[in-house]
Amino acid sequence: DALGADAVILDLEDAVSPQEKDAARILVRNALSLMGFSCQTVVRINALDSGLCQQDLEEIVPQGPTALMLPKTTSAQQIQQLDAAVSRLEQSHGMPLGKVQFIPLLETALGVENAFSIAAASSRILGLFLGGEDLTADLRCKRTKEGKEIDYARQRVVCAARAAGVEAFDTPFTDVNDDGGLWEDARYAKSLGFTGKASISPRHVPGINAVFSPTQAEIAYAQEVLAAIDEAKRQGRGAISLHGKMIDAPIVTRARQTLASAQILGLIGGETHGN
């Protein structure tokens, strides 16, 4: 049970000590095979150069997780190498080619600087994930609740993801007891364009969902915008206004995005306007 989360991340990397890697690999394999998760499943594998990655792939890929998370991704070449390895395993196990997607974890200065080439390196890329803790260590700066030290990285990751047509996932807020801080951090991430945000605690999931889900007011306004577009088309009008404000193409685009998100989350039905 993911407690309302859209996905659960099963970790084979930082959360597992070297002597426990084999046992963790078996546990994750069995969890994917037997537990029947009600949400998407992501497995953070060990780095390509760790000497552990191939074993991870051999155990995990046949179980068909939604995505693999590659830690400390710094180049498109790493993604292409991973793509080739996963493709071989999919073929050998009779799986559809491309079934398993990738979420590169950008947690170094080099990874952030190469964000677009990484995002565009494979059709398997589901989205980019920013790792704030390791990034600040690499930048030799202190990680703070306010997060100003990762502003540049956040903006660059979002821009790269959008340019490549993939999603952008924000770093977790690490103080599990500061609900107000989580709320502000999540709202700020959403304002930058992030699709969603990771959580290290189940208690953060409802707050994150509330921030990243469209509100009823946002849904109602988006529906009004698209209804106004439909009405203007019927009347042959080019200029469109709503509540005294001109409706231009970016507003229409955001309205459609809002309703698409609401549909995915089951907040509204499948019928839209303004197509």
Which residues does each PLM region occupy?
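Expand to "…catalyze enediolate/carbanion chemistry for C-C bond making/breaking, isomerization
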Residues: D1-N275
